[in-house]
């Protein structure tokens, strides 16, 4: 299993609207892509901003390509992201999941 990690930052007052936008765009597309095993959305308040960390879980890099295209390290953005995000970080990170709930043996 592979974890794909994307990070973004919004103004604190945009948190709820951006989360709703994420659910209607990226999270919806993740769920519709073959091989997606689920997504965690983590947030934290830092000063007047909200940091978002999305951890999407995938069966394989080939499945991630079904979502992101051949250049899997490139972040995927949607049209209104630029209205919310303070910075459009161009890349994401991928990690092999070494231990997950239910797999500790």
Indicate residue ranges for each PLM-predicted region.
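Short alpha-helical segments used as structural interaction elements across diverse proteins
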Residues: 1-4, 20
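Glycine-rich beta-strand-turn "strand-cap" elements at beta-sheet edges
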Residues: 2, 40-50, 77-105
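Short, well-ordered beta-strand segments in beta-rich or mixed alpha/beta enzyme
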Residues: 3-8, 40-70
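Short, surface-exposed ligand-recognition loops at beta-strand->loop->(often short) alpha-helix junctions
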Residues: 9-22
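Residues at secondary-structure transition points
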Residues: 12-14, 32, 41-44
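Residue-level signal for secondary-structure boundary sites
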Residues: 14-16, 62-64, 100-102
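An amphipathic, aromatic/His-enriched active-site/gating alpha helix that lines ligand/cofactor pockets
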Residues: 21-37, 57-93
């Amino acid at each position: 299993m592979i974890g794909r990690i994307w990070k973004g930052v919004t103004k604190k007052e945009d948190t709820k609207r951006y989360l709703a936008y994420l659910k209607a765009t990226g999270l919806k597309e993740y769920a519709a892509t073959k091989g997606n095993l689920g997504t965690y959305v983590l947030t934290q308040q830092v000063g007047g901003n909200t940091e978002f960390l999305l951890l999407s879980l995938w069966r394989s890099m080939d499945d991630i390509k079904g979502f992101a295209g051949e250049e899997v390290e490139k972040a995927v953005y949607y049209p209104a992201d630029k209205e919310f995000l303070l910075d459009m970080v161009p890349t994401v990170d991928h990690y092999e999941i070494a231990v997950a709930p239910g797999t500790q043996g």
